From Swiss-Prot:
Pfam families: DAO. It comes from the Bacteria. This is D-amino acid dehydrogenase. InterPro entries: DadA, FAD-dep_OxRdtase, FAD/NAD-bd_sf.
Amino acid sequence: MRVVILGSGVVGVASAYYLARAGHEVTVIDREAGPALDTSFANAGQISPGYAAPWAAPGVPLKAVKWMFEKHAPLAIRLDGTRFQLQWMWQMLRNCTTERYALNKGRMVRLAEYSRDCLQALRAETAIQYEGRTGGTLQVFRTQQQLDGAAKDIAVLREANVPFELLSSDELKKAEPALAAVSHKLTGGLRLPGDETGDCQLFTTRLAALAEQLGVKFRFNTRIDALAVAGGKIAGVQCGGEMVRADAYVVALGSYSTNLVASLVKIPVYPLKGYSITAPIVDAAKAPVSTVLDETYKIAITRFDDRIRVGGMAEIVGFDKRLRDARRGTLEMCVNDLFPGGGDTAKATFWTGLRPMTPDGTPIVGRTPVPNLFLNTGHGTLGWTMSCGSGQLLADLMSGKKPAIRADDLSVHRYLSETDGEHRPAYA
């Protein structure tokens, strides 16, 4: 089957790789000059299945009000005047219940754990290198309230059989020796030894090269204008003056997916703006070993070979990609507070990207009401974590194979159905 994939971020490239491996003839189209040059370019560098959780959580609405008055708040909202933004925020609010949080987190962990299995198999088969580390990830808490609040996440981890370690402030240095200097600031931590880290952009670039070896064709610097429809199916992709045709089409355009398919299917994928800095390491002994997540500021600090990536925060501001100095200041403050002297933040590069977020946190993977149109989008902050599993899942669905995990509650139909009350998230 001839398949056109729109988007060459980590999710699009993973989709291409697994579809090609399943025997399909695949073409990837992207407006950028190469793979992973937009949202996947400088993310936090985590592969964290155990930390897969929706932003829509109990207590978040009240926290959001408090964060409005904080200098280093992890969430900021600026109304853009669109109905879609208001609808999306209302849908997210309706998912901030204990019941829906547990349901949504369970789905996310299921896909994320499967995706890590797929990544490990890929690494064993191809020996792909991307500055990867398998030292786990550590979430650190600055207050007893945060430590106590981890109980609901631990319950989900237990149910999903995800290994974890609950550490005291003195035990944190066992996982991250450099934290010994600041242990007095911390009350404890939650460590997931099975999580991994690495450079997502490097991974995507090298996976694209592996996909090319399987026959995948990449068309970069190519504008994507519209999907042409005929007879109730997609007839082609309008790329400037050219119509690109195939048997099936996959939209993996992240936050840009929503507008492209708007006339065919309504999907609640909104751009959640995030930031990162990448600083050179100046003292390895004072730098992190793997990834440390600061629960207070919702910031991840990740060790690469000779660099530290610091990423996080969320702004609900539409497609505004302006870099804000205040956000850089928060990232620098956080890494210098936990790992003083580890990296040179004065020489750090500064970046922003738009995470494609659904109101329930779960991505949209699978079929649509249009017979030959498929979606692989809405992964939020977990694009890399879920990429391989989403790609393999989609390849199985498009090849007529039964997926290795449950997939029906990952498709867009969970938003469209009026009868699937148990697994249908709030969507007005």
